[in-house]
């Protein structure tokens, strides 16, 4: 939903440039863009709304947005269409699931459908659990559950440690693309928040896989706090393509009618960023060119792409690229220069 999309967009510029505080300004960097998190969130909204198989819809959206930052195995799954899931426990199942919490009427249906939609790719038990926990939070929040009721249910049902605060997590938290290392932290960011924007800021302040973690938090926060503030909704909607905006507003009209969403949809095409985009302190490149030059491998590492047709680094090259974020950025910085 748009709360999840907002988290993805706001977090897009911090995934490889983490910050560990809430007081960043502005909320939306002028460099902010939607990533694979938003693409697959909208794809699920579309699939549910039109009652079309999610695997078919995901592959179509992939063809429309092939450079949105997907993982290596998802690239392969879309490109070769084997029809087989790849046993992933990554947080991709949780990032795209927010629509499930709105489209079904009982917690049992929500859990069943979250498993169903996750299992096209993320059929590992942890991948399924992450999608179910996120969907359950959203369902309970929109039904009026208290934060403590949500905390208790998720802890008992899924075994996640939610008896922490963001201040407990932040100092030692590092990049983690697993469900088990992202979903609990995203839920805690929501639980510690005071309103929608604060939830987004809490999630960003943890660092890690910022776009996906904040995407998960944003989806839950929207369900709990209600309509997203209008100025935030407009900026998020504006960053989507017209086709994606149309899918979003159609889904809301069917499952969660909102004048705020309709107005954001109407205003999005008229919204203009006031200042020209400036270079980042580290690097600046537009979304399309960035994802043409790199690829994520199965472990979530950013690697340089060898050719334009998605050939990947050989095993020797992969083994010799460290998983350390700062080192990766230093080695690949030349790829991102204008």
Residue ranges and their predicted role:
Residues 1-338:
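Structured, active/binding-site neighborhoods that engage oxygen-rich ligands
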């Amino acid at each position: 939903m748009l709360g999840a999309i907002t988290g993805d967009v706001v977090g897009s510029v911090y995934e490889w440039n983490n910050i560990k505080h809430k007081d960043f300004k502005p909320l939306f960097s002028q460099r902010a863009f939607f990533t694979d998190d938003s693409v697959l969130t909208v794809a699920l909204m579309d699939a549910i709304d039109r009652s079309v198989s999610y695997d078919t819809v995901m592959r179509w959206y992939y063809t429309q947005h092939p450079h949105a930052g997907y993982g290596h195995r998802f690239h392969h799954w879309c490109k070769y269409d084997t029809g087989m899931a790849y046993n992933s426990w990554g947080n991709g199942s949780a990032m795209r699931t927010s629509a499930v919490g709105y489209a079904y009427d009982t917690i049992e249906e929500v859990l069943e459908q979250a498993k169903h939609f996750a299992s096209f790719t993320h059929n590992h038990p942890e991948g399924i659990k992450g999608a179910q926990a996120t969907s359950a939070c959203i369902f309970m929040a929109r039904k009026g559950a208290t934060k403590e009721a949500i905390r208790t249910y998720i802890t008992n049902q899924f075994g996640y440690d939610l008896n922490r605060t963001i201040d407990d997590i932040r100092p030692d938290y590092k990049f983690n693309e697993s469900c088990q290392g992202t979903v609990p932290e995203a839920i805690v960011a929501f639980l510690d928040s005071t309103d929608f924007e604060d939830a987004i800021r809490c999630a960003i302040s943890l660092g890690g896989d910022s776009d996906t973690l904040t995407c998960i938090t944003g989806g839950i926060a929207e369900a709990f706090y209600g309509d997203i503030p209008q100025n935030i909704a407009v900026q998020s909607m504006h960053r989507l393509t017209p086709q994606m905006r149309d899918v979003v507003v159609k889904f809301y009209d069917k499952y969660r009618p909102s004048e705020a969403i309709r107005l954001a949809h109407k205003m999005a095409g008229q919204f203009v960023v006031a200042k020209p985009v400036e270079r980042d302190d580290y690097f600046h490149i537009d979304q399309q060119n960035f994802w043409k030059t790199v690829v994520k491998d199965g472990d979530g590492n950013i690697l340089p792409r060898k050719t334009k047709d998605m050939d990947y680094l050989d095993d020797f090259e992969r083994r010799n690229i460290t998983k350390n974020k700062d080192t990766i950025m230093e080695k690949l910085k030349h790829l991102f220069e204008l």
